[in-house]
Amino acid sequence: MSVTQKKTEISTTTTYEGESRPSSGMSGFSYSAKIHPRTSGYINRSSQSPFRSSMGSNAAYTRSYDFSYGATAMPGRYANISSTGVNHVKANREREKQDMRDLNERFANYIEKVRFLEAQNKKLAGELEELKSKWGKETSAIKEMYETELEEARKLIDATNKEKITLDVRVTELIDQLERQQKDLEESRTYHQIDQEQIARQNQQLADLEGEISMLRRSIESLEKEKMRQSNILAKMNDEMEKMRMDLNNETINHLDAENRRQTLEEELEFQKDVHAQELKELAALAYRDTTAENREFWRNELAQAIRDIQQEYDAKCDQMRGDIEAYYNLKVQEFRTGATKQNMEVTRNKEENTKLKSNMTEIRNRLADLEARNAQLERTNQDLLRDLEEKDRQNELESCQYKEEITKLRGEMESILKELQDLMDIKLSLELEIAAYRKLLEGEESRVGMKQIVEQVVGARPNEAEVLSTILTRSEGGYEATGDSQISMKMMRGELAAKTTYQRTSKGSVSIKEADSQGCFIALETKKEENLTGWKIVRKVDDNKVYTYEIPNLVLKTGTVVKIWSKNHQAQARGDDLVSRENDTWGTGSNVVTILQNEKGEDKANYTQNTVYQ
């Protein structure tokens, strides 16, 4: 909290020719006030001017001004409640400080003029003495009363400013901490996004590998099926080969059987030959016993013919049997040889295919093992990333909860501070109104009949120097009286200033203006049923010389809901579905304010009027 004390000292010394008389009344006047500036410095100004009065006395006036003001920074919290509000307060402070300087200068000039007039107004000494005796005590009482009130007000302002500065510093620290936390949160979100992208890439690689594994498995299954088919073909060919081997064995057995039959038949033939030879011998013996040569010749010829026929028939039958057996045997041997060659070729081809399939299966199994190992590694990496992601999500949720709690706490503190600031602004507004009233009273006092002409005659007219006193001496009305040769005494008479504000609301339809902030922060709309406000316009007229407009964008107001349209300088207070007017820094303030809600056709649907009358 910074305190500035401004002190004006005016001293007067009067010397008369012929005799020295001490001046009666006030030989010095001092005034002090406390304000709250933003800079520090010290100004000392003095002047001395001798003059001669009409009564022949020499008077020397020494006027000195000591101005000191300073600013000190005290620790506190909440450095930035609202940049707009603080700038507004700063501007008002600077304006009030400048007004204080001007008023003090004018007050000093006014006192100087009155001192000059003392030499001219000796004839009024009795009346002034009477006024002094009559009003002196009342002035002291009023002065003490106002000094007590001002001291309490200063203490209250000092305590409030100290608490405000503490809260400002705390707000600054929390805002810095919030910015750091938000930066960490952004970094965490960036890392989270990178992890998400990496997980997506890993999932894509995993999907590709799973697709490749599935394709390899399908290839293995097809190769297994092909192998099974080849095995079935090989088994079938082995069965056929076994069958052919059995057929060959059967044919060999049949061949041996035929050989045996042939040998048997040959033996039987030899036996028949022997039998026939024996019969022939018997017949020959019978023939020999026949004495007839013709009979012997006949039987010999018949027997030879029979033997030849039998021999031819037997040879033909043996040749036929031999040819059939040889043909059948050669056919079977040829078929066996052809089948064995084909089977050998199939077996060789199957062996080559089996070898190739085995090598492919070995390669696929090795690759499958590598892919399974890589898949397991990727799954472990994916699990690790998921765990890290879950951990970061939990941390982010915890930090988010902490941030939300901090923000809620800060908003509560900010609301309380804004409420205090609003109270201070109301007090400040009342002080400004009282300052304006006091200024008018002083101007009226200066312009009383005869006073202005006397001042202009003695010291000359000085324009723009008729306003007096500071914002601290508010709610007061000033008067003056002078007694003695060089004495000035001040009397404060209590005055009052009141402000009366009236509000009037009208609406045509379901939508109405619920509230229009007197400080120009926001305008609140409410509706009794659902209404589409897209294209509607708000027109706010301030003291008939300033117009603020805002066109509502895409907005559908639900039944029973209230929406606030904030000015640009107060958009930090917007919440939820509230709107912000980017075109208007403020909605404006004044004594006569009219807020109108128009639909898209330009028809007035609602009206909110605010009138303030100062009394």
Curated annotation (Swiss-Prot):
UniProt-annotated stretches for the region Linker 12: 285-303
Region (Coil 1A): 100-135
Family the UniProt entry places it in: Belongs to the intermediate filament family.
GO cellular component: intermediate filament; nuclear envelope; nuclear lamina
A GO BP annotation: nuclear pore localization
Keyword Coiled coil set for record: yes
Name assigned to this protein: 70 kDa neurofilament protein
Renumbered residue ranges of the record's region Coil 2: 304-449
Domain LTD positions: 499-612
InterPro entries found in the cross-reference section: IF_conserved, IF_rod_dom, Intermed_filament_ifa/ifb, Lamin_tail_dom, Lamin_tail_dom_sf
Residue stretches making up the IF rod domain: 96-449
Disordered, as annotated region: 1-31
Pfam families, per database record: Filament
Residues covered by region (Coil 1B): 146-284
Chain intervals with Polar residues compositional bias: 21-30
Location of region: Head: 1-99
Record carries keyword Transferase: no
SS bond list: none
Region called Linker 1, residue ranges: 136-145
Domain of life where this protein originates: Eukaryota
A GO MF label: structural constituent of cytoskeleton
Keyword vocabulary terms for this entry: Coiled coil, Intermediate filament
Ranges for region Tail: 450-615
